[in-house]
Amino acid sequence: MAFISSGYNPEKPMANRITDIGPRKFDEFFPPVIAKNFGSWLYHEILEPGVLMHVAESGDKVYTVRVGAARLMSITHIREMCDIADKYCGGHLRFTTRNNVEFMVADEASLKALKEDLASRKFDGGSLKFPIGGTGAGVSNIVHTQGWVHCHTPATDASGPVKAIMDEVFEDFQSMRLPAPVRISLACCINMCGAVHCSDIGVVGIHRKPPMIDHEWTDQLCEIPLAVASCPTAAVRPTKLEIGDKKVNTIAIKNERCMYCGNCYTMCPALPISDGEGDGVVIMVGGKVSNRISMPKFSKVVVAYIPNEPPRWPSLTKTIKHIIEVYSANAYKYERLGEWAERIGWERFFSLTGLEFSHHLIDDFRDPAYYTWRQSTQFKF
């Protein structure tokens, strides 16, 4: 067989070498004014909800308009955003980590025209396509996971309850009346690919029943040892069962050990865990990532279970709106939701909000590392 050279020359190992096949370098996408003043900014201000101004050492100013957007978008919607960016922003726009979109302009005339254009664009039903807001002491856009549209283990939907919640708190998205920012996040199950456990308000889908076992198909669809190994609590074990006149290899589950995580279903399609009666959500509050005033902290469960109520999830949205209203009426300025709860005490939190306290809310997690490792920049040697 003839040797076919790949073009590699051992005497010149770096010749024609491709060292980066990922996304292009980020600074290639900067608007000209951002590229000019990169690393040389003096300060920024929030002029009004959804509108920011950054001032550079050179005196240049950048006006940013933040609009709420869906996490799952149609191609036509994305093209419309690109058309707006072409018209006002030289073809530049920016997606934020909370599913917002930011348009940046360099003068007040363009800012005014951009805001008027965004406010004029509406869906057929009358709702705004590009609502301006999500800055400062208000409710920003919701970060969420996949939900029923894609994932195989969700205990609740993502896009459905997120839409319903944002409709309920939309006034706070477009205003800054709250004591401090409120971050709301949603995860469809406790595997939490969206990481909502450090949010002011976190919604987490939970299963309450162990997986159902399709014994007839288990051995045909699954690698049983893999399903057994996937269980973090050793609740899954191999077994044999007689079905009709034949004995089959299958799986047994110790219900008292199951934590309803759905890992076994990921490994074995014959172990579906979704259940219309058992699935629902919990509400967690008090988390944050910021180091301001107090250290970062995890959220705590304050509502142990709310059933799924599609398409508008009325019990969930009503409870979240109520928590925000009580927080707004009682917290100090700049005080995050968790800081307010810790200042007044969690007993007082439940008293003010009227939420029911039960043994399901008691945090029994114990890990010495969590209490001994440094968790923030707030320490002294």
Swiss-Prot record:
PROSITE patterns: 4FE4S_FER_1 (PS00198), 4FE4S_FER_2 (PS51379). Residues 249-276 form the 4Fe-4S ferredoxin-type domain. [4Fe-4S] cluster 1 binds at C151, C188, C189, C193. It holds the Pfam family NIR_SIR_ferr. [4Fe-4S] cluster 2 binds at C231, C258, C261, C264. Keywords: 4Fe-4S, Iron, Iron-sulfur, Metal-binding, Oxidoreductase. It catalyses: [DsrC protein]-trisulfide + NAD(+) + 3 H2O = [DsrC protein]-dithiol + sulfite + NADH + 3 H(+). SUPFAM superfamilies: 4Fe-4S ferredoxins, Nitrite and sulphite reductase 4Fe-4S domain-like, Nitrite/Sulfite reductase N-terminal domain-like. Its cofactor is [4Fe-4S] cluster; siroheme. Catalyzes the reduction of sulfite to sulfide. This is the terminal oxidation reaction in sulfate respiration, a process catalyzed by the sulfate-reducing bacteria. Heterohexamer of two alpha, two beta and two gamma subunits. This is Sulfite reductase, dissimilatory-type subunit beta. It comes from Nitratidesulfovibrio vulgaris (strain ATCC 29579 / DSM 644 / CCUG 34227 / NCIMB 8303 / VKM B-1760 / Hildenborough).
